Amino acid sequence: MLSKLLRLGEGRMLKRLKRVADYVNTLSDEVEKLTDAELRAKTDEFKKRHADGESLDDLLPEAFAVAREAAWRVLDQRPFDVQVMGAAALHFGNVAEMKTGEGKTLTSVLPAYLNGIGGKGVHVVTVNDYLAKRDSEWMGRVHRFLGLDVGVILAQMTPDERRVAYNADITYGTNNEFGFDYLRDNMAHSLDDLVQRGHNFAIVDEVDSILIDEARTPLIISGPADGASNWYLEFARLAPLMEKDVHYEVDLRKRTVGVHELGVEFVEDQLGIDNLYEAANSPLVSYLNNALKAKELFHRDKDYIVRDGEVLIVDEFTGRVLYGRRYNEGMHQAIEAKEHVEIKAENQTLATITLQNYFRLYDKLSGMTGTAQTEAAELHEIYKLGVVPIPTNKPMIRTDQSDLIYKTEEAKYIAVVDDVVERYQKGQPVLIGTTSVERSEYLSRQFQKRRIPHNVLNAKYHEQEAGIVAVAGRRGGVTVATHMAGRGTDIVLGGNVDFLTDQRLRERGLDPVETPDEYEAAWHEELPKVKAEAAAEAKEVIEAGGLYVLGTERHESRRIDNQLRGRSGRQGDPGESRFYLSLGDELMRRFNGAALEAMLNRLNLPDDVPIEAKMVTRAIKSAQTQVEQQNFEVRKNVLKYDEVMNQQRKVIYAERRRILEGENLKEQALEMVRDVVTAYVNGATAEGYAEDWDLDALWTALKTLYPVGIDYATLTRRDADGGFDDLTREELLEALLKDAERAYATREAELEEIAGEGAMRQLERNVLLNVIDRKWREHLYEMDYLKEGIGLRAMAQRDPLVEYQREGYDMFMAMLDGMKEESVGFLFNVTVEAVPAPQVAPVQTPEGLAELGAPAEQGGTATAARDEAPTQLRAKGIDNEAPAMTYSGPSEDGSAQVQRNGGDAKTPAGVPAGASRRERRAAARQQGRGAKPPKSVKRR
């Protein structure tokens, strides 16, 4: 119902976009007459008009006409009217649903150019580094032709290179890099370390993949914790010895494991411990669960691969390797132990944000995808984004065949290979979609046996992705690929002309960034030749039936299936698609597989005879809908809990930024001193009369905070009975506040003698930043610990979310109080020394980056500007080096979790590992006390 309501305004929006495209068309003749220099000068004209008060909406028709003409002159590609409509939808802050092959990348050039004129920056977000680099070079040619700077953010870049890229008018990069840079900026200790300059406008390519599929994936920057435990190896040894459905059970749908009583007894006997669930042994439960999950739920060459002794996660939606990403909650270490590779240290969360909350930082957000209607409700509810389906440039004539279902996987793959061989023999290109690296390599071996030339595209061959996809539409091409979702290169019948042309030019040593002039000249010379060759081959492919897409398994998301199908039939080309299924497929096993198997058994069909039935289609659709609803609920739940952290994060990050930007912090520091002293006094004088106050304890506490300069005896008068006379709490507080302010002034004078004027301001900044960071890290740990167990509140008929909000708020306020107290203590008591300021070396910027956005007069060298400081303060215990950081990914359910350390288990002294439970209990009773932890656990 919500989806229907959201689509009510589609007709009006399409009419509005059509009027925009028509208006842009009326300007075409005028723009075509302009010389290259005059076309480029339009950018300066638009910037001036915008600065004089003209809105970007007012400039839209002219700017789009100029960008459209520039694309034609530079790329030999003129955006169609439907692409202009899509571009307008993006500018107005919508998701443009454009089918595969309709030119989404070219469409993004127009709104990026228009919003780049505003000078506040445009972020074009892609799904991987390759596409970010490719688009910044390819589409960047248009922007540079028109006089705009273009930058690209890549994983290996230094902070100085990133700063140059962010200062460009248009910046390309991945969602992870943008998000991690935001987190790093909010961990910086100097303005010079900041790289981003705000969140103005984002265009998200494959928006459903990034904002929906990866929304369960919080971005986490972690630092090393206390160290890894040998328990991972011990439980990796035990897990294979335990039997499924005897020692434990597995729920594939929820992706959980549950240990039976027999399993608990088995582990206790193996480890030589008395009770797995007593407090001292409770960390072992997590090791056990992770070892069983690694055994049953995480499969090599599907969920991860092992390369060069390292476990690398494979994205379940795109099939790409997620370099640098690790499972949390000890899951990655459990998999490393299972695969017998080096177990890397566990991590502590330093900073985290969900992609949902990161992208909601942008003033304006838009996106492109070929499949958004199925997620329109979620995009509207979470991001306030409308979905506008853009008409195709030519009618779609692809034939989508009904699914074929086989009883066994073996029979299914035999049929797949036979079908592909038949298509290959008549010259029809085939794209086979698989769900795992293992399956793609199995099919590859079958094709080798049948001597069918083919390409394999999976996580192991990620680097060759663009080249493989670009030639997948050539005559007789056979391509085996895992999860075609998000593959940014078009499959064009006869071959991708742009890619093939670029490939030939690069073979000649030409590059669009390094040698732009020679590249442009050679491009226009080579392009017609490649076009002619590709057109002749495309004609043969069309006669053979166009691209045939063959899916070997249904994905849990209908969108992924639709994206795979959408690779065929682009721009009015003929094409065909079909899915081959079996009862052994994961989706069928998780949902409704038993009913289908019973039906096939009743029909008594041979294994190699498939069925086509509406029941199959309904069962698959029902299963996919259930999974999508589950995933939506998970994402909504993640967002609800992260919203609590998000409000707290905003407060902390705003405070850090204020400190970094150089505001005089003296008054804030003095206010902290007053607050802490007041809290101490209130605590000591809360109850009773003056004679009941424990001023000795108060003075002892205050002396640990700052050098108290007065004795309370001088503030009081004793009466005949020895009690205090006429001393009020207000008088006591006033005297102590004056004394604390005096002590602060004395401290400031001492520091200025050591390091000159402004030394106290420098110490205030260092102390506040370090205390904020340390307390925030501790708070993240505590909040994750709270979230981990908050679900149990439901057993007491309490709403876990409400409890999390309430306790999270109390913990946050307690953290702020602790922050004040710790800061005041450091300001008064930390030992400092003056050291020479470090010399600033010029930062060398690669020539390519200078082209992509560095000012011309820099000549390829950028020098970070810093205030001159002859000396700096070094505070012991404060100016510590930042810990080594890692950038980790999701746990298996996508929720944000922190890895924590466990302790060692306890065993009764003198009882060998492997003794029976009765023997261990008897030994414990004889000792009459708790057991001591052994130095190690012996194996049987």
Swiss-Prot record:
InterPro entries: Helicase_ATP-bd, Helicase_C-like, P-loop_NTPase, SecA, SecA_DEAD, SecA_motor_DEAD, SecA_preprotein_X-link_dom, SecA_SF2_C
Renumbered residue ranges of the record's region Disordered: 856-940
A GO molecular-function descriptor: ATP binding
Alphabetical list of CDD domains matching this protein: DEXDc_SecA, SF2_C_secA
Record localization: Cell membrane; Cytoplasm
Family label: Belongs to the SecA family.
Function: Part of the Sec protein translocase complex. Interacts with the SecYEG preprotein conducting channel. Has a central role in coupling the hydrolysis of ATP to the transfer of proteins into and across the cell membrane, serving as an ATP-driven molecular motor driving the stepwise translocation of polypeptide chains across the membrane.
Subunit structure, as described in the record: Monomer and homodimer. Part of the essential Sec protein translocation apparatus which comprises SecA, SecYEG and auxiliary proteins SecDF. Other proteins may also be involved.
Entry protein name: Protein translocase subunit SecA 1
Organism: Mycolicibacterium paratuberculosis (strain ATCC BAA-968 / K-10) (Mycobacterium paratuberculosis)
